[in-house]
Amino acid sequence: KNTLLLLFILINLPLLGQENQPVNDSIVVGETKIDSLYREDQFYFGFTFNLLLNRPEGIRQSGFSGGLQLGYLRDFPINKKRTLAIAPGLGWSINSYGQNLLVTENKNDESEFYILDNENDYSRNRFTNYLVELPLELRWRSSTPESYKFWRIYAGVKASYIYHFKSRYEGEGNNVTQTKVEELNRWRYGVMFTFGYNTFNFHFYYSLNPLFDANTTEYNREIGLHPLKIGLTFYIL
């Protein structure tokens, strides 16, 4: 009986070893080890030039308006070749807009909006916002497990929240800073599109809802302002 038990154990040892072996998702080509379950473009950062569209009469941009964005997108391939994927993520951005809309408040702590004309002498009027972002992309790429250089076309939507806003006016003997504006739409919703090859990728984002739900104090014009961002995005890993 002991001999039969010993033979049974010896026969099954190789099978037990195979069961405990980790699954290898890599393919060896020559001396190169290739990951067949690769993911792409999970960390990103980029720079944008910011425009304000749907401006009422009299509002114009001045100086440089730009932004910085960075974040993480979890890549989930949805086909066997891994050239199609969906990617939800979490990001952060800062955006600055130079323009001639003065944001101030009256004695009752109510917001007021004035369009600055050429008769107003000021050196700076700009608002800056800081956002937490939730992007979601549908991705196509010409990637393979062997190559890091490929074409990509990504389209998606993004929800963002402005957790800090600052409007800063600097004029002759008068500086005004506003951080609490009730008419500000802190929740932002927009569509985005990215395309490019290898390192350089063009990025576009358009906000579907206006920045302010308010009218100008003096002329009673709807402010609106829909940000459009145009820039470059870079991906890592």
What are these regions (language model features)?
Residues 42, 51-52, 59-117:
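Glycine- and aromatic-enriched membrane insertion/assembly motifs of diderm outer-membrane
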Residues 18-75, 235-237:
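Short glycine/proline- and aromatic-enriched beta-strand/turn motifs that initiate or cap beta-hairpins
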Residues 29-41, 77-84, 143-151:
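Short loop/turn motifs that connect adjacent beta-strands in outer-membrane beta-barrel proteins
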Residues 32, 38, 180-237:
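Predominantly the C-terminal beta-signal and adjacent terminal strand-loop region
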Residues 47-53, 90-98, 140-142, 157-165, ...:
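Transmembrane beta-strands of outer-membrane beta-barrel pores
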Residues 70-76, 90-92, 132-140, 155-159, ...:
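Residues on the lipid-exposed face of transmembrane beta-strands in outer-membrane beta-barrel proteins
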Residues 39-41, 62-68, 84, 128-134, ...:
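Residues that define the transmembrane beta-barrel architecture of outer-membrane proteins
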Residues 56-63, 98-108, 112-129, 162-172, ...:
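Extracellular/periplasm-exposed beta-strand and loop segments of Gram-negative cell-envelope proteins
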